Amino acid sequence: MRHPLEYQRRLGRALAYMARHLHREVTLHEVAAEACFSPYHFHRLFVALTGETVAGHQRRLRLERAIQQLILEPQRPIGEIASELGFSTSQNFAKSFRLFYGHSPSSIRACGDFTRVDQLLRQHG
């Protein structure tokens, strides 16, 4: 396949698939199949075009969604958010969150709005 638009269309299908499945971890094989590529070729293409692995991209999407939920649903238990986003435990979620953002989910929630979250994350990053 030599047509860039076809690559874009197929990559778009893979990205949409990942976004629809934030509630669980998806495998490289699943996402590659959705885009009609071999896992090897898809991995190379995905990293070249996005700068991320499939697992890294999905983790980032899940953690970005977590920030939205922490701010928009301040009364919702963090463990419930973690479970909905496919993390096996709230401790696993908190560890992933802290490694990615440099802050705990509760400290992000305490910011209260997206502007303050952005300021806090810029200090870290």
Identify the meaning behind each predicted range.
Residues 1-5, 71, 95-125:
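…primarily DNA-binding HTH/wHTH and HhH modules…
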